[in-house]
Protein backbone atom coordinates (compact mmCIF):
# COMPACT_ATOMS: atom_id res chain seq x y z
CA UNK A 1 0.00 0.00 0.00
CA UNK A 2 1.29 3.46 -0.93
CA UNK A 3 0.92 6.33 1.53
CA UNK A 4 0.66 9.89 0.21
CA UNK A 5 1.63 12.70 2.60
CA UNK A 6 1.44 16.00 0.68
CA UNK A 7 2.70 19.33 2.04
CA UNK A 8 0.24 21.16 4.25
CA UNK A 9 -0.86 18.14 6.28
CA UNK A 10 -0.22 17.33 9.91
CA UNK A 11 1.86 14.19 10.45
CA UNK A 12 3.38 13.21 13.77
CA UNK A 13 3.77 10.52 16.41
CA UNK A 14 3.20 10.69 20.15
CA UNK A 15 4.82 8.37 22.68
CA UNK A 16 2.64 7.38 25.64
CA UNK A 17 3.74 5.36 28.65
CA UNK A 18 0.64 3.75 30.14
CA UNK A 19 1.23 1.32 33.01
CA UNK A 20 -0.66 -1.70 31.74
CA UNK A 21 -0.45 -5.18 30.31
CA UNK A 22 -0.56 -5.37 26.50
CA UNK A 23 -3.99 -7.00 26.50
CA UNK A 24 -5.36 -3.96 28.35
CA UNK A 25 -4.55 -1.75 25.36
CA UNK A 26 -6.57 -3.57 22.72
CA UNK A 27 -8.66 -0.41 22.38
CA UNK A 28 -5.72 2.03 22.05
CA UNK A 29 -6.37 2.75 18.36
CA UNK A 30 -10.05 3.46 19.02
CA UNK A 31 -9.07 5.81 21.84
CA UNK A 32 -6.69 7.64 19.50
CA UNK A 33 -9.48 7.98 16.92
CA UNK A 34 -11.71 9.67 19.50
CA UNK A 35 -8.84 11.97 20.52
CA UNK A 36 -8.20 12.96 16.90
CA UNK A 37 -11.90 13.54 16.24
CA UNK A 38 -12.19 15.75 19.32
CA UNK A 39 -9.17 17.78 18.21
CA UNK A 40 -10.57 18.27 14.71
CA UNK A 41 -13.86 19.42 16.24
CA UNK A 42 -12.08 21.83 18.59
CA UNK A 43 -10.30 23.53 15.68
CA UNK A 44 -12.88 23.32 12.88
CA UNK A 45 -16.27 22.89 14.56
CA UNK A 46 -16.76 19.67 12.56
CA UNK A 47 -16.76 16.27 14.29
CA UNK A 48 -15.68 13.72 11.67
CA UNK A 49 -17.08 10.24 11.27
CA UNK A 50 -14.97 7.28 12.38
CA UNK A 51 -14.36 4.33 10.09
CA UNK A 52 -13.55 1.38 12.33
CA UNK A 53 -11.09 1.42 13.65
CA UNK A 54 -8.36 3.83 12.62
CA UNK A 55 -9.64 6.35 10.05
CA UNK A 56 -11.51 9.64 10.33
CA UNK A 57 -13.89 10.41 7.48
CA UNK A 58 -15.52 13.56 6.09
CA UNK A 59 -18.11 13.33 3.34
CA UNK A 60 -17.35 9.65 2.83
CA UNK A 61 -13.65 10.34 2.21
CA UNK A 62 -10.59 9.74 4.38
CA UNK A 63 -9.43 12.73 6.41
CA UNK A 64 -7.10 11.07 8.89
CA UNK A 65 -5.26 7.81 9.38
CA UNK A 66 -3.99 6.38 12.66
CA UNK A 67 -1.44 3.66 13.37
CA UNK A 68 -0.45 2.42 16.82
CA UNK A 69 2.16 0.07 18.20
CA UNK A 70 3.39 -0.92 21.63
CA UNK A 71 6.74 -1.97 23.06
CA UNK A 72 6.80 -4.59 25.81
CA UNK A 73 9.31 -4.97 28.64
CA UNK A 74 10.92 -8.39 28.40
CA UNK A 75 10.83 -9.27 32.10
CA UNK A 76 7.59 -7.76 33.40
CA UNK A 77 5.68 -8.25 30.13
CA UNK A 78 4.12 -4.85 30.77
CA UNK A 79 3.88 -2.07 28.22
CA UNK A 80 7.07 -0.01 28.06
CA UNK A 81 5.68 2.50 25.59
CA UNK A 82 2.89 3.04 23.09
CA UNK A 83 3.34 5.03 19.88
CA UNK A 84 0.37 6.72 18.23
CA UNK A 85 1.09 7.90 14.68
CA UNK A 86 -1.45 10.28 13.14
CA UNK A 87 -1.75 11.94 9.73
CA UNK A 88 -4.44 14.55 9.04
CA UNK A 89 -5.12 16.11 5.63
CA UNK A 90 -5.36 19.83 6.36
CA UNK A 91 -4.79 21.73 3.10
CA UNK A 92 -6.49 21.39 -0.27
CA UNK A 93 -3.83 19.95 -2.60
CA UNK A 94 -3.59 18.28 -5.99
CA UNK A 95 -3.39 14.51 -5.64
CA UNK A 96 -3.30 11.61 -8.11
CA UNK A 97 -6.87 10.84 -9.27
CA UNK A 98 -6.93 7.42 -7.59
CA UNK A 99 -6.04 9.07 -4.26
CA UNK A 100 -8.12 12.23 -4.67
CA UNK A 101 -11.29 10.17 -5.15
CA UNK A 102 -11.08 8.88 -1.57
CA UNK A 103 -9.23 11.71 0.19
CA UNK A 104 -10.75 14.59 2.17
CA UNK A 105 -9.11 17.67 3.67
CA UNK A 106 -10.25 20.13 6.31
CA UNK A 107 -9.73 23.07 3.96
CA UNK A 108 -11.79 21.49 1.17
CA UNK A 109 -14.59 20.52 3.56
CA UNK A 110 -14.83 23.70 5.65
CA UNK A 111 -13.49 26.29 3.23
CA UNK A 112 -10.79 27.34 5.67
CA UNK A 113 -7.24 26.10 6.11
CA UNK A 114 -6.78 25.07 9.76
CA UNK A 115 -3.98 26.31 11.98
CA UNK A 116 -1.81 23.20 12.13
CA UNK A 117 -0.01 24.26 15.30
CA UNK A 118 -3.34 24.74 17.06
CA UNK A 119 -4.59 21.39 15.73
CA UNK A 120 -1.42 19.61 16.91
CA UNK A 121 -1.74 21.17 20.37
CA UNK A 122 -5.41 20.18 20.59
CA UNK A 123 -4.58 16.64 19.53
CA UNK A 124 -1.76 16.17 22.03
CA UNK A 125 -3.95 17.59 24.78
CA UNK A 126 -6.81 15.27 23.81
CA UNK A 127 -4.51 12.24 23.72
CA UNK A 128 -3.11 13.04 27.16
CA UNK A 129 -6.59 13.52 28.61
CA UNK A 130 -7.78 10.21 27.18
CA UNK A 131 -4.63 8.42 28.33
CA UNK A 132 -5.53 9.44 31.88
CA UNK A 133 -9.08 8.17 31.29
CA UNK A 134 -7.99 5.04 29.41
CA UNK A 135 -9.47 2.77 32.05
CA UNK A 136 -11.43 4.98 34.48
CA UNK A 137 -13.71 6.51 31.83
CA UNK A 138 -13.50 3.78 29.23
CA UNK A 139 -17.26 3.32 28.82
CA UNK A 140 -17.79 7.02 28.08
CA UNK A 141 -15.32 7.33 25.23
CA UNK A 142 -16.27 3.92 23.82
CA UNK A 143 -19.85 5.21 23.58
CA UNK A 144 -18.52 8.30 21.81
CA UNK A 145 -16.59 6.10 19.40
CA UNK A 146 -19.65 3.96 18.67
CA UNK A 147 -21.91 6.99 18.21
CA UNK A 148 -19.69 8.33 15.42
CA UNK A 149 -18.57 5.02 13.88
CA UNK A 150 -20.08 4.78 10.40
CA UNK A 151 -18.97 1.15 10.04
CA UNK A 152 -21.60 0.04 12.55
CA UNK A 153 -24.79 -0.97 10.78
CA UNK A 154 -23.06 -1.43 7.42
CA UNK A 155 -22.36 -4.45 5.27
CA UNK A 156 -18.58 -4.87 5.11
CA UNK A 157 -15.79 -6.97 3.68
CA UNK A 158 -13.40 -8.51 6.19
CA UNK A 159 -10.04 -8.98 4.48
CA UNK A 160 -7.44 -11.25 6.08
CA UNK A 161 -4.62 -11.79 3.60
CA UNK A 162 -6.24 -13.39 0.55
CA UNK A 163 -9.33 -14.44 2.52
CA UNK A 164 -12.39 -12.20 2.07
CA UNK A 165 -15.54 -12.63 4.17
CA UNK A 166 -18.75 -10.61 3.87
CA UNK A 167 -20.57 -9.65 7.05
CA UNK A 168 -22.76 -7.05 8.74
CA UNK A 169 -21.20 -4.85 11.41
CA UNK A 170 -23.50 -4.95 14.44
CA UNK A 171 -21.50 -2.87 16.94
CA UNK A 172 -18.37 -2.93 19.09
CA UNK A 173 -17.55 -4.70 22.33
CA UNK A 174 -15.82 -3.39 25.46
CA UNK A 175 -12.41 -3.62 23.75
CA UNK A 176 -13.62 -1.78 20.61
CA UNK A 177 -13.55 -5.03 18.61
CA UNK A 178 -16.08 -5.10 15.78
CA UNK A 179 -19.04 -7.42 16.39
CA UNK A 180 -20.06 -9.27 13.23
CA UNK A 181 -22.60 -12.07 12.69
CA UNK A 182 -21.63 -14.23 9.71
CA UNK A 183 -24.14 -15.56 7.15
CA UNK A 184 -23.80 -19.06 8.63
CA UNK A 185 -25.23 -17.82 11.94
CA UNK A 186 -21.96 -17.63 13.87
CA UNK A 187 -20.74 -14.41 15.47
CA UNK A 188 -17.28 -13.01 16.11
CA UNK A 189 -15.53 -10.06 17.73
CA UNK A 190 -12.97 -8.87 15.19
CA UNK A 191 -9.85 -7.12 16.53
CA UNK A 192 -8.31 -4.29 14.53
CA UNK A 193 -4.98 -6.03 14.06
CA UNK A 194 -6.55 -9.14 12.56
CA UNK A 195 -8.35 -7.91 9.45
CA UNK A 196 -8.93 -4.93 7.20
CA UNK A 197 -12.55 -3.76 7.08
CA UNK A 198 -13.74 -2.24 3.83
CA UNK A 199 -17.08 -0.77 2.89
CA UNK A 200 -19.17 -2.60 0.33
CA UNK A 201 -20.17 0.52 -1.58
CA UNK A 202 -17.15 2.83 -1.51
CA UNK A 203 -14.26 3.80 0.73
CA UNK A 204 -16.14 4.12 4.04
Walk through the language-model features, giving the residues of each.
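Short, acidic Gly/Pro/Ser/Thr-rich loop/turn segments
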Residues: 19, 73, 90-93, 177
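Cytochrome P450 core scaffold surrounding the K-helix E-X-X-R motif
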Residues: 91-101
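Conserved RNA-binding domains used in RNP assembly and mRNA/RNA metabolism
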Residues: 152-204
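Contiguous, small/hydrophobic- and glycine-enriched helical/loop subdomains that border
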Residues: 1-81, 102, 109-137
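Active-site beta-strand/loop microenvironment that shapes enzyme catalytic pockets
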Residues: 81-93
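Short boundary/loop segments of OB/S1/cold-shock single-stranded nucleic-acid-binding domains
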Residues: 137-161
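Conserved beta-strand residues within beta-sheet cores
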Residues: 60-65, 142, 153-155, 166
